[in-house]
Design a protein with these regions (language model features):
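Conserved catalytic or regulatory cores that recognize and/or transform ribose-phosphate-containing ligands
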Residues: 1-108
Length: 108
């Protein structure tokens, strides 16, 4: 049975950025992706925001994100992704292992 939703993974810089700003940027990215008209399906953003991950180190976050990337129909990279180490790794995983498409939010 085909999934009735388009599962979107959003990759974005998070280090040193407040949760509020991260959520704001994700919403902007979601709206941008919707405006592309890529799919007629309902868009489900994969929840990779790990707010309460006490004791996690950078590679813990990254390993969780890599697992979630495997479930994506598409991956959206938000502005300045190329300045964040984790996003660079996510890009390589998306490029070589995700069956969906890769989208880039334009820089302003």
């Amino acid at each position: 049975m085909e999934n009735e939703k388009f599962r979107l993974f959003i990759s974005q810089p998070m280090s040193g950025i407040s949760i509020e700003k991260i959520k704001e940027d994700r919403q902007r990215g979601y709206e941008y992706f919707k405006s592309l008209g890529v799919t007629d399906k309902e868009i489900e953003v994969i929840d990779n925001l790990q707010e309460d991950a006490e004791g996690y180190i950078a590679t813990d976050y990254l390993s969780t994100d890599i697992k979630l990337l495997g479930r994506a129909d598409g991956v959206l990279f938000l502005r300045n992704w190329d300045n964040a180490r984790g996003c660079k790794v996510e890009y390589l995983v998306a490029k070589y292992y995700v069956n969906g498409d890769i989208f880039m939010e334009p820089k302003i």
